[in-house]
């Protein structure tokens, strides 16, 4: 099953928990974790359909306000 990890950078003036709540509502999301380091949140997504996975990242995630940047990692 295709899996993706998305590193999320958020607006510092906006509560992380609100973004985490919105991310948890997206299709294909399995886990959302707040982290320390250059990124604020790590999101794990998985789906049998690669198109649905890409759509969750490229269409739904980018619409969440206060996400300033993302980096998607897909293991081989």
Can you say where each PLM-predicted feature lies in the sequence?
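A compositional/biophysical signature of low hydrophobicity enriched in polar/charged and small residues
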Residues: 1-76
């Amino acid at each position: 099953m295709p899996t993706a990890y998305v590193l999320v950078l958020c607006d510092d003036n906006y509560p992380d928990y609100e973004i985490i709540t919105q991310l948890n509502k997206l299709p294909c999301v399995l886990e959302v974790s707040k982290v320390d380091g250059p990124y604020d949140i790590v999101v794990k997504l998985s789906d049998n359909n690669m198109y649905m996975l890409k759509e969750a990242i490229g269409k739904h995630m980018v619409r969440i306000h206060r996400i300033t940047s993302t980096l998607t990692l897909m293991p081989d």
